[in-house]
Amino acid sequence: MTKQPEDWLDDVPGDDIEDEDDEIIWVSKSEIKRDAEELKRLGAEIVDLGKNALDKIPLDADLRPAIELAQRIKMEGRRRQLQLIGKMLRQRDVEPIRQALDKLKNRHNQQVVLFHKLENLRDRLIDQGDDAIAEVLNLWPDADRQQLRTLIRNAKKEKEGNKPPKSARQIFQYLRELAENEG
């Protein structure tokens, strides 16, 4: 019996897989299913958007009609259509779609935070008066001090008289206009 040299396996043709770039990455079946389910949820989020928001998301020619059809369908047909949309999304680069969707969600969250800040500022204006007016004038130098004082005085009277808070709403609207004109 002849003994083979120990390096005889190194001479096998086609065995040049020493590059890390050529390495095969194995993905489990469960991970593939999780990714497919996540894309189906992404498709459902897109389907739940309104027409104006849908226009802001980059969708190609055959994906958009599928989404519009899913918006019109109810019950079991909708589920099947969402499956189809998920399948279509698997064949595409979904990163631009995700970014546009995140941008839409973030814009809504920023607006909610801004409204809470304006409501707190309105309440401080009613409670503190001139100190809070100085804060508003620092934030928005073009704000009308006299109009703010009038609205604050009326809001205090309405609060004391247990009347509907018409002036408080007007203060909020005025602050919102100032914030929108700024940005």
Swiss-Prot record:
Keyword Cytoplasm belongs to the record? yes
InterPro entries named in the record = DarP, DarP_sf
The molecular function terms in GO held by this entry are:
ribosome binding; rRNA binding
The compartments listed are: Cytoplasm
Give each disulfide bond as a residue pair. none
Respond yes or no to whether keyword Lipid biosynthesis is given for this record.
Answer: no
Picking any one GO biological process from the record gives: assembly of large subunit precursor of preribosome
The record's listing under Pfam families reads: DarP
> Keywords of this protein's UniProt record, alphabetized?
Cytoplasm, Ribosome biogenesis, RNA-binding, rRNA-binding
Output the Gene Ontology cellular-component terms: cytosol
Question: Superkingdom, according to UniProt?
Answer: Bacteria
Family assignment?
Belongs to the DarP family.
**What PANTHER family does the record tag this protein with?**
UPF0307 PROTEIN YJGA (PTHR38101:SF1)
Outline what the protein does. Answer: Member of a network of 50S ribosomal subunit biogenesis factors which assembles along the 30S-50S interface, preventing incorrect 23S rRNA structures from forming. Promotes peptidyl transferase center (PTC) maturation.
Protein name as it appears in the record: Dual-action ribosomal maturation protein DarP
